[in-house]
Amino acid sequence: MRIQVKGRSGFSVDAELLARVEKKLGKVGRQVSPLAELEIELREERNPAIRDGQVAEATLHLKGVTLRACKRAPDMGHAINLVADDLSRQVKKHRDKRRARREAHRVAQERAA
């Protein structure tokens, strides 16, 4: 899986954040095809009235489907963890749906034959 990390609105991505993204989203990479592409955007909301000012947005491009997750947290590391968990849940749900459809189709063909 190819991972592309971007910093938006003047947010700079340092080596520590890059390593954290690789580690946490690598778990998602084991669940999907090696051809999948993941784009993650990290940014900081500058409004002091917003408590959860650190934002992580992830877009996972798979064959035939695009999964998105956007999470906010007071700390960027926590926002990355939340996005990774959400994407992992979405990938599992998508995989289970595909498996159920494939199995239902196979059973229908066996009954018809």
Language model regions located:
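N-terminal, polar/charged subdomain of small-to-medium soluble alpha/beta proteins
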Residues: M1-A113
